[in-house]
């Protein structure tokens, strides 16, 4: 399998399951450490969930790219608004996504890319 995989999907909650399936297949084909799969799947789900909730446009593009033992998960959406971790109160039912990504990834970032941005996270694989 190539060292990268790309999928363009509807910007909808249902896309998360399809993209997790792509991640599982990619992990297996790239012979990644299966013990790292749950963390990578949660990071992917949070990135996709943020794009679904906060971005604009009908679609989003997800790219998985492996470099050695690092998997970059990148989500390109149509919103120019950059993500920012915030403190969620105990009662809040949302608002922890970027904190989860920060905890589970080696690093994460955001790059402007017209007409929106790419939010990415590097996880061990």
List the model feature ranges, each with a label.
Residues 1-6, 51-125:
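Conserved beta-strand-loop-beta-strand hairpin that lines the nucleotide-binding pocket
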Residues 3, 17, 24-28, 56:
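Two-component transmitter module helix at the DHp-CA junction of histidine kinases
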Residues 6-18:
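STAS-typified acidic loop motif
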Residues 21-45:
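Conserved short strand/loop->alpha-helix "switch" segment adjacent to the catalytic nucleotide/phosphoryl-transfer site
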